[in-house]
Amino acid sequence: MSAIEVKNLVKKFHGQTVLHGINLEVAEGEVVAIIGPSGSGKTTLLRSINLLEQPESGTIRVGEITIDTAKPIGQQKGLIRRLRQHVGFVFQSFNLFPHRTVLENIIEGPVIVKGEDKPGAIARARELLAKVGLVGKEGSYPRRLSGGQQQRVAIARALAMRPDVILFDEPTSALDPELVGEVLNAIRALAQEKRTMVIVTHEMSFARDVADRAIFMDQGRIVEEGEAKALFANPQQARTRQFLEKFLMQ
C-alpha cells in the first residue's frame, strides 16, 4: 500500500480553481520532488495533504487514514488529528516558537501532543540535533540562530514526532544563498535513510539528484511526472521543456 494517495483533489480560492482534480501516489520510502512555476499549485497541494488547506472535493489517504474532503471537516476532526500525527511538515518560514529554546521547540509536540515522557523526548531531541549538525544549540533561542540553523531545527522538530511522511514546502526559499547547502544536506541525509518525503522546491539540481520521482505542475495540474533524472534529462511535454530550458542549458 502506498504511503500517500490523493484522488481527484479539487481546491478553489475565491471561486477560482487552483487544483484541478489532482491524483498522486507516493510509495513508502519514496522521495518525490514537486517543481513548477510560482502559482502552479505546488504549495497548495502540499498543504492540502496535511489539511492545512481544505479542498472542495477529493480524498486524501496517509497510511490507513482516509479523509473525504467533500464531507464537512468538522465531522472529521478526530481523523484529521490522527492523520497529522503521521505527517511532518517543514515550512519555508521555519515557524519556530520565538520565546522557546531549540530544545523546547523540539519536545513540545512529542510531550504535549503524543504524551511522551519528557526525559525520553529530551534524549531524542539531542539525537536529532546531532543528526542535523546542531550539537550544543539546545539552549539557544531562534533569534540567535541563522536561517539555515532555524530550518534545521524545524526539520529536527518534524522528525521528533516520528512521522511516516515528511512534507517540505520550499525549505530553502527564505534562506540566504550561502545557507541553502546546509539545509539541503540535512534533507539529502534523510533521503538516504529511505524516508517517505514530498519536497516542493525551486532547487532543480537537488530535485534531480535526490528525488526518486519528479512531478512538474503548472496552472493547478500535473503536466508531467517520472523518474527524476529522466524527467530532467529528457522532458516529454513542451511546457516542461520550456520551464526547464534554462536549467538544461547549464
Whereabouts are the PLM-identified features?
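ABC family nucleotide-binding domain
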Residues: S2-A228
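C-terminal boundary and immediately downstream tail of ABC-type ATPase nucleotide-binding domains
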Residues: Q219, E225, K229-Q250
